Amino acid sequence: EKILVQHETLHQLDIHDTFQYVEDIIEEDTPTLVLFHGSNIAFDKIDLNKSHNRRDFGRGFYCTVLEQQANEWANRLYLRTHTGGKYVYRYIFQQSEELKIKHFATLDKEWLEFVKLNRTVGDIQHHYDVVIGPVADDNTMETVQLYLSDILSVDEAVTRLRYNKVNNQVSFHTPLALEHLILESRKDV
């Protein structure tokens, strides 16, 4: 019941309300969170070694709380490669105190520096099992690229980013984190 309410509620909220909703769930005693992953590849088991490099939060397995966003990821990957299919995976994330979780509630200086480090150096530049926060996507990429190229200062970039509509992402970086991510279903889209 709670999961259905979560799914229905998130599609009616703006991004700030969505982030607050995710934060409220994370702060509960035994939270579970429904997550979605979009891909052009059908798989049964997550392999962190197949993760792409130089992503916002480092090499990892990326999900979102928004099913529509996962649909868009699947479509984009399929159009880019013209291989496989279009799949959306539905997972249940069971948070645990044993996990080190970093949560970015907004597009701020700390988020921007974190993304810069992971995108420029590559691999994983942190010690978190799970990272939650905004996506540097089509809406924000121009500003992020200008910052990465040292054309904008961090303060100028953060000011510009405040006006962007953003989506969210939840990334899993360790085998321990994946133990708390349970596959519920996979569907063709």
Describe the role of every protein-language-model region:
Residues 1-33, 55-56, 76-189:
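Conserved NAD+-utilizing ADP-ribose enzyme module
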Residues 30-55:
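Short aromatic-glycine-(Arg/Gly/Cys) micro-motifs in beta-strand/loop hairpins
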Residues 40, 60-62, 135:
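Compositionally biased, intrinsically disordered low-complexity regions
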Residues 42, 67-70, 95-99:
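Short, charged/polar surface micro-motifs in flexible loops or helix N-caps
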Residues 52-77:
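Extended catalytic/binding region for NAD+/ADP-ribose chemistry, centered on the ART fold
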Residues 37-39, 63-65, 91:
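Short His-Asn-centered micro-motif
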